[in-house]
């Protein structure tokens, strides 16, 4: 009987130790660096597991902060940087292909006029604020959101929503292309916008407070419309999701 109790006590202690280890919070490791960037320079971030947040500021430099979330079974990644006076390119470098990728979340500050020519992640959201240069952003599983856009935007998602709030419309020669497969698209325009809209959804609705005639019934719907005198081409496409085009209440 004594041996049985001792055995049960040992098993209980082992189970408790395993549960404690599995419940241990993941470790966070922070890396940060700054690089000068010429006016109108280019910034790119390539990631796999984790989000990308970019914010514009008044300094002529790029500040990159990477936060790695080291959970059980993951190995620390390296942060690769290629830089020149006109370009800063950041990439997550994993030690081995057969290991589970560690989560790396990027927080990046860039000059307001910088061009974001390649914000890429596989599993994670992309958020952009107060950047007035051209933007190209792509994620497979995550949302894309930009506040204060004023130039060409190319945003693509597979499973995720896209939200774009424009401070000003780009020039007539520029384009806005927002595309997702499984997700909604929300576009907020200045109230006196001049643009040419092309919208299409296969299983969803198109709604707008800027257009006179819109589709209120779900289904395979395509709509073209000109706002004001026309201008930059705006293409909004989703397969399974709704599209909305409304005034940006923060811009008059």
State each model region's role.
Residues 1-252:
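Intrinsically disordered, low-complexity terminal regions
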